[in-house]
Structure formats: C-alpha cells, structure tokens
C-alpha cells in the first residue's frame, strides 16, 4: 500500500507541476517583492526570512534547525485513532499542542528538552499572523532546507490549532522495541506507516543529535556528518558498537562505533530487525532515496489530524536545499570488517575508508538565545 501511495503522490506532484507551469497565474504579494500561486502563501515569505536570519543564523544547518525538525514529529505523532475508538481523546496530531500547552507536553518523558526550541520559536509566532500548528511544521521545513542534500519539504497553511493537550504515551521512545514503534506509527497514521515507512521517517536522524539521553552530554550526533543530509547515518548504525560517548548505561542508548557519536537503541534494533534490515541497508549511498522517501513521509506526517482539503499548499516558499556534499565512506579506522551484516538478501556494499586517525565526532553546540 505504501508504494502505491508513493507512486500516486509522485504522479500527482508531477502532473500538478506540469499543469502549474502552464496554467497557474501567480498572485502578487503585498510585500511588492514576491509572488505566489495562492495569496494565503504570501505571509510565509516574511516568516521564512525572519526564521533564516534570526533563528537559523543566516540559513545554517545548526542545532536550531535540527530541533525545529524534531519538533514537527513530536507534535504530529501525538494522535491515536485507537484511543478515539475507545471514547478517549487521542490527541490532534499536527495541531501545535506541544507549543500551546508546553507546561504539560514538554514534561512528557520523550519530549524532555523540547521546551528550549519552543521558547526560541515563541517570539516568531507572536510577530507573524500564523497558527502555531502551521508554524511548527513550516519552521521544521525551513530548518531542514539549510542542510545540504535535504529534500524540499512540504508546507501547508490552514491547520486548526489545538484546544487541549495531547495525552501522554503517544511519542515513541528510544528504548521502545521495534514492535512498539511500528504499532505506534501504524496507529497514528491509520495504517499507512508500516515498518518500511518507519525506516523512511528515520532518515531525519541524519541531521539529528541527542541532548537528554545521556545526562552528562548534550548535542551528541547520530552520525559523523550532522550538518549534512546524507546517508552516513544508515551506514554508521550498522557498524559494530564499541563504546559510549559519555557515561554509558543510559536508557535507550547502546554502544556506538565512534567517539562522540550517540546510537539510540531503537535505531540499532530497527537496523537489524528482519522486517527492516534490507530496507535500512538500501539507503546506504542512495541519496535520491534519502531525499524522496523522507519528502513523502513528511508530507503525510505534517498533516496528521488535519483535513488536507482545507489546507493550502505553500511548498513553493520552502527553499530548495543545496546539493549534497561529499561521498559515502567508512569513517577513518573502520571498514567493511566492522559491519554487522543484518540484511540476508544483499551483501553490504564496499566503500573507501577516510585516511587518518580513527574518527571522533564533535558535539553539535546547543542553541544559544536566538535574536529577538
């Protein structure tokens, strides 16, 4: 079903792009500079410029960009049709509840630490005419666009803001089993996000870092290139873990192959699960797949709980990211001999090893106070 949906999505996008190029009349925006296919998108140009200059440091793939993308997931995934079927409020999905009720939702265990990016984003929401729900997803898309190699992510306006907080227990934790994570995503997506699409969604970890898994360390990247949207994450999670970057023994953490690199237990187990191991390996050195599949799942994730027929597509406002940089490689000191082969169908591909002493990964600096 997922692949049929993707084919339909790609076909529709291609048809719309062709039709738009030939038929769409653009609207002149009130700023006298920009034009848009829908007047509702005009407001986003000012939001974009404000974000780029005053939150993302002139358009950089920094901690603020990483955390803004993370926030999109933690807001959107908080929806459960299964709870609703029991007569229990199951959350509103991509409705902004995590930022509207931060005193409640940022105290949920998987959301610990997100209060910082929510506080940084508050002044931007206050000075622009945009719903909290729309802002969270838009800021995540803009933040990701600053990471070379990323896809252009979807942006919509018209979401309804939350009127009550989401219940606890709806955001997956790094210590959850694959079955728990697969079941949670299937519930939130009404069956669309199967184990394969879960792998696609985890592509976001290519530009992610952990601030709260290890209480003694912050900004621990999940791969050696957290500033790039590449496929090193998929390669490095299949390397044999040898040590912890900090105190070790923390819930949701397993040994990683590189000094300074964090490996989540959930990434480790999904990369080695028989249902997902080959899909995981298929992302290694496949940049188009790392872009297209995440673009697809983000599109759907960003509208969980919303009626797409009431939304306006403003993806054109999101910058097209820079081309990917570098090449797939084994970090210095490691090679195919260090791979824990999990896919039974296809041998792990061979790549060059970086020269020099064994790679150590620098932490991603925590966000300083954004310029108000």
Curated annotation (Swiss-Prot):
Pathway assigned in UniProt: Secondary metabolite metabolism; lignin degradation
Cofactor, free-text remark: Binds 2 calcium ions per subunit. Binds 1 heme b (iron(II)-protoporphyrin IX) group per subunit.
Residue(s) at site: Transition state stabilizer: 70
UniProt keywords, alphabetically: Calcium, Glycoprotein, Heme, Hydrogen peroxide, Iron, Lignin degradation, Metal-binding, Oxidoreductase, Peroxidase, Signal
PROSITE patterns: PEROXIDASE_2, PEROXIDASE_4
InterPro entries: Ccp1-like, Haem_peroxidase, Haem_peroxidase_sf, Ligninase, Ligninase_C, Peroxidases_AS
EC number: 1.11.1.14
Function: Depolymerization of lignin. Catalyzes the C(alpha)-C(beta) cleavage of the propyl side chains of lignin.
Name of the protein this chain belongs to: Ligninase C
Organism per entry: Trametes versicolor (White-rot fungus)
Taxonomic lineage from the root: Eukaryota, Fungi, Dikarya, Basidiomycota, Agaricomycotina
């Amino acid at each position: 079903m997922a692949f049929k949906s993707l084919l339909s999505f790609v076909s529709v996008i291609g048809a719309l792009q062709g039709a738009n190029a030939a038929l769409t009349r653009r609207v002149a925006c009130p700023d006298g500079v920009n034009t848009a296919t829908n007047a509702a998108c005009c407001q986003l140009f000012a939001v974009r410029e404000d974000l780029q200059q005053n939150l993302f440091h002139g358009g950089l793939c920094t901690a603020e960009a990483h955390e803004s993308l993370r926030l999109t997931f933690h807001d959107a995934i908080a929806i459960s049709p299964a709870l609703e079927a029991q007569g229990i409020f199951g959350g509103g999905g991509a409705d902004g509840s995590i930022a509207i009720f931060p005193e409640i939702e940022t105290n949920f265990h998987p959301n610990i630490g997100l209060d910082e990016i929510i506080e940084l984003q508050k002044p931007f929401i206050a000075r622009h005419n945009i719903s909290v729900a729309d802002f969270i997803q838009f800021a995540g898309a803009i933040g990701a666009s600053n990471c070379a190699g990323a896809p252009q992510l979807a942006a919509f306006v018209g979401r309804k803001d939350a009127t009550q907080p989401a219940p606890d227990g709806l955001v997956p934790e790094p210590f959850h089993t694959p079955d728990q994570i697969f079941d949670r995503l299937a519930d939130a997506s009404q069956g669309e996000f199967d184990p394969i699409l879960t792998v696609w969604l985890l592509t976001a970890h290519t530009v992610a870092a952990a601030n709260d898994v290890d209480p003694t360390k912050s900004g621990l990247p999940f791969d050696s290139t957290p500033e790039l949207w590449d496929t090193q994450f998929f390669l490095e999670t299949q390397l044999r873990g040898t040590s912890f970057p900090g105190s070790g023994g923390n819930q949701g953490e397993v040994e990683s192959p590189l000094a300074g690199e964090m490996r989540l237990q959930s990434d480790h187990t999904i990369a080695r699960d028989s249902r997902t191991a080959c899909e995981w390996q298929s992302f290694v050195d496949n940049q188009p797949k790392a872009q297209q599949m995440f673009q697809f799942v983000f599109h759907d994730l960003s509208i969980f709980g919303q009626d797409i027929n009431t939304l306006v597509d403003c993806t054109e406002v999101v910058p097209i990211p820079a081309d990917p940089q570098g090449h797939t490689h084994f970090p210095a000191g490691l090679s195919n001999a260090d791979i824990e082969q999990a896919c039974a169908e296809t041998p792990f591909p061979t790549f060059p090893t970086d020269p020099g002493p064994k790679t150590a990964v620098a932490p991603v600096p925590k966000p300083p106070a954004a310029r108000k």
